[in-house]
C-alpha cells in the first residue's frame, strides 16, 4: 500500500491497481478522527449523520487534490443490499436532485465515464 499526502489529505493506493493506466483508484482515511466523534475528521458521507457543510468542504478538498470537479464525485446512499448503480451518460444528464434520488439505496457503482469518481 502506498500513502500519498497532499494538502493535509491522506490517500492510500494499492499497487495492484496500477495495472490499468486508465483507472486511478484510492482510499481516503479519517485517521485524525477523535475517539468520541468519528465525524471529526475527513468525513465524505452525506448520509452518515455528520455536518453537511463539513462534508461539502471535504469533497471540495478531495476535488482539488485529485483534480476532478466535486460535481463529478458520486457516493451513493448505501442500503447494504445488492443494488448496483450505473453512472453513465443518462445519469450524467440528470439534474442534481434526480442524481441524488438515483443514488439512494445503491450499494455499488460502475461507470465508463472519464474523469468521474465513484465510491462507497
Language-model features: locations:
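Active-site microenvironment for binding and transforming phosphate-containing groups
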Residues: 1-120
Amino acid at each position: 500500500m502506498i500513502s500519498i499526502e497532499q494538502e493535509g489529505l491522506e490517500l492510500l493506493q494499492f499497487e495492484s491497481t496500477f495495472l490499468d493506466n486508465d483507472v486511478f483508484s484510492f482510499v481516503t482515511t479519517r485517521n485524525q478522527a477523535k475517539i468520541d466523534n468519528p465525524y471529526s475528521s475527513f468525513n465524505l458521507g452525506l448520509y452518515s449523520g455528520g455536518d453537511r457543510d463539513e462534508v461539502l468542504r471535504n469533497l471540495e478538498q478531495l476535488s482539488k487534490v485529485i483534480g476532478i470537479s466535486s460535481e463529478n464525485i458520486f457516493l451513493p446512499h448505501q442500503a447494504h443490499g445488492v443494488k448496483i448503480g450505473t453512472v453513465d451518460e443518462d445519469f450524467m444528464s440528470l439534474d442534481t436532485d434526480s442524481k441524488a434520488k438515483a443514488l439512494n439505496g445503491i450499494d455499488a457503482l460502475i461507470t465508463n465515464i472519464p474523469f468521474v469518481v465513484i465510491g462507497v
